[in-house]
A protein has these predicted regions:
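Intrinsically disordered, low-complexity serine/threonine-rich repeat tracts
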Residues: 29-62, 67
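A surface/extracellular/periplasmic glyco- and lipid-processing/surface-interacting theme
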Residues: 63-107, 112-371
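Bacterial N-terminal signal peptides that target proteins for export
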Residues: 1-9
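Bacterial signal peptide processing site
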Residues: 24-27
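C-terminal motif of bacterial Sec signal peptides marking the signal peptidase cleavage site
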Residues: 19-22
Length: 371
């Protein structure tokens, strides 16, 4: 009986062993633990932000520099003074001139007795210095002054000329009965005739004009008819280092010669066999531009005198020299209150060289030659 128990117990033990063996030694292999893998999260592709396009920096527009309306020269401040025209003695016994070297424009023309006289125009009379010698008024001087809204300066005039002046309404300063003028005693002592001794300082003329209640400010709305360029040498012009201006009227002749001086950059003024120099400074009278206005000149008998009066309204032909070259041009003046304007023969505007101008009023019989 004990034997049976033993066998039964053995069977139980063997069964248990099989169970435990299956549990203890039979772990199924497992894959090692791994961290979960993640794909990188990417945002939708976007373009990098860009700055809006910017325009290239631009320089602010520069204000045009103020210029002298009669010469085109750059000046420090806007010119606001009214122009002055001065009647200049030009007969040989009256020379040398004073102050013509400072004129912006200088007109020469027959006036009476087949002699010429000058009309010097200044945009800045206050700084013109001593001017003269000053002589009496002539018809065309009033005419030109009116066209440029200028105050005309003179030493009297005949009854007919003074009547014409009053009719024109042009403001004037008369050295015979107004202040601002002086007689040069040194000239008188050295033998000059009295009529060749009257002078005035520009600043004194300005003061006298103000004293008399004349408007002394420039009409800034007025077009003075001139355009300028740094180099006014005319394209296609003929060589003209010397321009000989033989003013001829009724068989009488007066010659002015303009000689180009490259060092001075303009034409020196020669007459009576001499180069004109300033009586105060000794400097040569020199002009960047030489203009010849060809027109009809008539004799007019008035107050017992014979005057030479040029037709300065309308249009006509002429010449222009600058930089050693010369061309034919046209001139125009539309009325008594208008200045001169100049064009090429094809009608395009003429550009003058920056600087002063000598202008000859030439009767139609005149001879203009150059070389």
């Amino acid at each position: 009986m004990n034997h049976k128990i033993t066998l039964g117990l053995l069977a139980v033990l063997m069964a248990l062993a099989l169970v435990f063996t299956g549990c203890a030694g039979g772990e199924e292999p497992t894959e090692p633990a791994t961290e979960p893998t993640t794909e990188p999260i990417t945002e939708a592709a976007t373009e990098a932000p860009t700055d809006p396009p910017t325009e290239a920096p631009t320089e602010p527009p520069t204000e045009p520099q103020p210029t002298n309306p009669l010469t085109g020269e750059v000046v420090e401040a806007e010119m606001t003074g009214r122009f002055f025209c001065v009647s200049i003695n030009n007969v040989k016994p009256a020379l040398p001139h004073r102050g013509v070297v400072n004129a912006d424009m200088y007109f020469e023309m027959f006036i009476n007795d087949y002699c010429t006289r000058g009309l010097a125009m200044y945009a800045d009379i206050e700084n013109a210095g001593s001017i003269g010698s000053i002589r009496s008024l002539r018809y065309n001087f009033t005419d030109i002054a009116q066209g440029y809204d200028a105050i005309v300066v003179h030493a009297g005039g005949s009854d007919s000329v003074m009547s014409d002046l009053r009719s024109s309404g042009v403001n004037n300063l008369n050295g015979n009965n107004m202040g601002g003028f002086y007689r040069d005693s040194g000239r008188k002592a050295s033998g000059y005739a009295t009529e060749h001794t009257l002078f005035a300082y520009g600043e004194d003329l300005l003061a006298e004009a103000a004293k008399r209640g004349y408007r002394t400010t420039l009409d800034t709305e007025k077009d003075f008819g001139l355009t300028f360029t740094a180099d006014g040498t005319p394209a296609g012009g003929e060589t003209a280092n010397t321009v000989n201006i033989d003013l001829i009227h009724k068989g009488y002749s007066k010659v002015s010669t303009m000689v180009y001086d490259s060092d001075l950059g303009g034409y020196t003024y020669q007459q009576y066999g001499k180069t004109m120099v300033d009586d105060t400074t000794g400097g040569k009278e020199c002009f960047e531009n030489v203009i010849v206005i060809v027109t009809v000149v008539e004799n007019k008998v008035a107050s017992g005198n014979t005057y030479h009066v040029a037709e300065l309204e309308g249009s006509g032909s002429g010449y222009f020299a600058c930089g050693g070259k010369i061309i034919s041009i046209n001139w125009k003046r539309s009325g008594p209150n208008a200045p001169f304007s100049f064009t090429h023969t094809d009608g395009t505007p003429l550009e003058l060289g920056v600087g002063s101008s000598y202008i000859a009023i030439a009767p139609t019989a005149s001879q203009i030659t150059w070389q």
